[in-house]
C-alpha cells in the first residue's frame, strides 16, 4: 500500500461519488471510504429525525467539519490557522473511525475537501493521496441545475481572491457558476500536486466508473491493493432521486460557449480535459460543431 494512509477526492460534485464509494467498499481491502463525511448519526424517526438532523449539523457533525459555512469564509480570507484547526478536528474523528472499523486507509469521497479544507489537511498531514474524479463539464452543470441547488452553500463566488481562476461573476448565469466551479476544482487538483506533499495521485472519469480497466488503473496509481473490480451501477442519480434526467441540450451548450468566451487562453491551456472538448457532439452526433476558444 502507498505511504499515504489518507486519500482525498478532488471533485466538483454530482460526479459519481456515491458510485465510487461503493466500488471502494467492495473492492479495496482495509479501506474506510467516507462519502461526504461527517454525516449526522440520526436515531429518531420522522419529523423528530429532521429536528435531530438540524441539531447535529449545527452542534456535532457541523457544516464546518463537513467543509461548508465558516470554512468557505476562512478560505476566502486566507485564515490558514482556522482551516488547520478544523482539519485536525476531522482527523481525530477519522482516526476513531479507522480504529473502530479496523481499516488502515481513509478514502475521503467528498466535494467539500477541495473547497478549503484541503489547505488544513495538507498542513496537518505529511503526505496524502489525491484522486481527481471528473465528469463531463456540461453534464455536470446540467446535473446541478436539475437539483436546484444553492450555489453559495458549497462554493465561493468566482470573484474571491482565494481562487486560482478569478472572474467577474456579476452577470454570470447559474450554469456559468457551475462551469467556473468545475474549472476551479480542476485547477486546484493540479496546484495541490505541484505544491508537494502528495504521495500519489490518479484520475477517474465519471463516465468510466463502470469500466473495470479504467478504475483498476487509477487504484493501482494510488498504490492500493484491490480485488477484481466489477461494475456496481450508477448510484444517487437525478432520476433515482426524483429529479429530471441529465441531458445536454442546446441551451446547455450555449451556456458553455458563453462561459468559454470569458476564459483567458492561458487558463484554458492548463485544463487538459478541455483540449478538443466539444459538448455539441452530445446533441446530434455532429462532430463538426465548433467549440469556442477565447482569443485572449
Predicted feature locations:
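PAPS-dependent sulfotransferases, especially Golgi type II membrane carbohydrate sulfotransferases
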Residues: 1-7, 174-178, 186, 190-201, ...
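PAPS-dependent sulfotransferase catalytic core
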Residues: 1-89, 283, 288-296
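Hydrophobic/aromatic beta-strand patches that form the interior of the parallel beta-sheet core
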Residues: 7, 32, 129-131, 202-204
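PAPS/PAP-binding and catalytic site of the sulfotransferase fold
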Residues: 16-29, 119-125, 145, 200-227
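Glycine-rich phosphate-binding loop used to anchor ATP phosphates in small-molecule kinases
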Residues: 85-117
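PAPS-dependent sulfotransferase catalytic domain
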Residues: 85-95, 142-217
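Conserved phosphate-donor/acceptor-positioning beta-strand/loop module used by diverse small-molecule
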Residues: 110-112, 124-147
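Short beta->alpha connector loops
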Residues: 110-115, 209, 237-241
Amino acid at each position: 500500500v502507498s505511504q499515504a494512509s489518507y486519500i482525498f477526492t478532488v471533485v466538483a460534485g454530482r460526479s459519481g461519488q456515491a458510485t465510487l464509494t461503493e466500488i471502494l467498499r467492495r473492492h479495496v481491502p482495509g479501506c474506510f471510504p467516507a462519502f461526504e463525511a461527517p454525516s449526522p448519526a440520526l436515531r429518531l424517526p420522522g419529523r423528530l429525525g429532521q429536528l435531530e438532523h438540524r441539531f447535529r449539523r449545527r452542534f456535532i457533525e457541523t457544516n464546518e467539519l463537513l467543509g461548508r459555512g465558516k470554512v468557505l469564509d476562512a478560505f476566502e480570507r486566507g485564515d490558514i490557522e482556522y482551516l488547520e484547526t478544523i482539519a485536525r478536528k476531522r482527523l481525530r474523528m477519522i482516526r476513531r473511525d479507522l480504529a473502530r472499523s479496523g481499516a488502515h486507509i481513509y478514502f475521503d469521497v467528498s466535494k467539500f475537501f477541495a473547497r478549503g479544507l484541503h489547505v488544513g489537511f495538507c498542513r496537518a498531514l505529511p503526505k496524502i493521496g489525491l484522486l481527481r474524479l471528473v465528469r463531463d463539464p456540461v453534464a455536470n452543470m446540467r446535473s446541478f441545475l436539475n437539483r436546484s441547488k444553492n450555489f453559495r452553500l458549497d462554493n465561493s463566488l468566482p470573484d474571491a481572491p482565494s481562487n486560482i481562476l478569478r472572474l467577474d461573476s456579476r452577470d454570470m448565469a447559474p450554469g456559468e457558476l457551475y462551469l467556473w466551479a468545475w474549472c476551479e476544482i480542476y485547477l486546484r487538483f493540479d496546484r495541490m500536486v505541484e505544491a508537494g506533499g502528495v504521495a500519489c495521485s490518479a484520475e477517474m472519469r465519471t463516465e468510466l466508473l463502470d469500466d473495470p480497466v479504467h478504475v483498476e488503473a487509477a487504484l493501482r496509481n494510488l498504490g492500493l491493493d484491490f480485488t477484481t473490480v466489477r461494475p456496481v451501477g450508477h448510484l444517487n442519480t437525478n432520476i433515482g432521486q426524483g429529479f429530471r434526467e441529465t441531458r445536454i441540450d442546446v441551451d446547455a451548450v450555449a451556456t458553455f460557449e458563453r462561459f468559454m468566451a470569458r476564459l483567458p487562453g492561458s487558463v484554458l491551456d492548463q485544463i487538459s480535459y478541455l483540449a478538443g472538448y466539444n459538448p455539441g457532439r452530445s446533441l446530434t452526433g455532429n462532430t463538426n460543431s465548433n467549440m469556442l476558444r477565447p482569443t485572449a
